From Swiss-Prot:
PROSITE patterns, alphabetized: RIBOSOMAL_L1
Free-text function comment from the UniProt entry: Binds directly to 23S rRNA. The L1 stalk is quite mobile in the ribosome, and is involved in E site tRNA release. Protein L1 is also a translational repressor protein, it controls the translation of the L11 operon by binding to its mRNA.
Coiled-coil features, chain-numbered ranges: none
Family to which the UniProt record says this protein belongs: Belongs to the universal ribosomal protein uL1 family.
Stated name of the protein: Large ribosomal subunit protein uL1
Keyword Lipid metabolism on entry: no
GO cellular component, one term: large ribosomal subunit
GO terms of molecular function: rRNA binding; structural constituent of ribosome; tRNA binding
Keywords annotated in UniProt: Repressor, Ribonucleoprotein, Ribosomal protein, RNA-binding, rRNA-binding, Translation regulation, tRNA-binding
InterPro entries noted in UniProt: Ribosom_uL1_bac-type, Ribosomal_uL1, Ribosomal_uL1-like, Ribosomal_uL1/biogenesis, Ribosomal_uL1_3-a/b-sand, Ribosomal_uL1_CS
UniProt superkingdom: Bacteria
Gene: rplA
Gene3D superfamilies the UniProt entry points to: 3.30.190.20, 3.40.50.790
Keyword Membrane: no
Amino acid sequence: MAKKGKKFQDAAKQVEALKAYAPKEALELVKKIDFAKFDATVETVYKLNVDTKQADQQLRGAVVLPNGTGKEQTVIVFAKGAKAEAAKAAGADVVGDDDLVQRIQDGWLDFDVAIATPDMMGQVGRLGRVLGPKNLMPNPKTGTVTMDVEKAVADSKSGKVTYRTDRDGNVHVPIGKVSFDVDQLLGNLQTINDTIVRLRPASVKGAYVQNVSVASTFGPGVKVDFSQF
C-alpha cells in the first residue's frame, strides 16, 4: 500500500481511530481536517451485512438530497416528440434520439446523468458497454428510465444521487461539499441513513448496518456512531 502524504497523516492524527463520533461531530471533524486546495466532496460509506450474490440483498436506487450535492449536473435525455420538448423545458442540457446515441458511440461522454423514455431503450441499449461501466446507463431502479422526464430532470438538477452496493456490501454516496454548513451535510446524511435503513432486505439476519464513516475527497475516514441517528 502506498504511503500516505504528510498532510493526510497530520489530518489522521486528529481522528481517534477507535472512536465512533456522533454524526454532527463527525462532520464537523471532516470539515476541520480537510486539506484539499479545492472544495472537496464529502462522502459517506455504509458497510452493510448483505450477501450481494443474492439478488434480493443488492441495494440500488436513487434519492434526492434535501440540500443538494453542491455540483452542477449535466443531464442528457433520450426522447422524441413531446417528451423531448418537455425535457428541454425542464432544463435538460442535451436532448436527442438516434443522433444522441450516435454522438455517444462516437466518443462523447461529457455528462453526469442520462435519462431515457422507455421507447428509446432499444436504441440506448446499444450503449451498454460504454455507459454501463461508468454507471451512466439509464435504469428504472434509479428513476432514469421514465415517461416523467420533467421530474427526472428536475430531480437530477436539484441533488439526486444514486447508490448501489459494491461486491463487498459497501455503499458509497456523496453528501455535499466541504463548504456546506454542518447542518446541510447532516440533513443529507440523515436522508441517506433513512433510505438505507428503510431498504433493509427481509432476508438479512443479524445486524444490518455494520459501520458508517464520512470523509472528504483526500481526507481520512471518520467513524460515525449510527445509533445516534
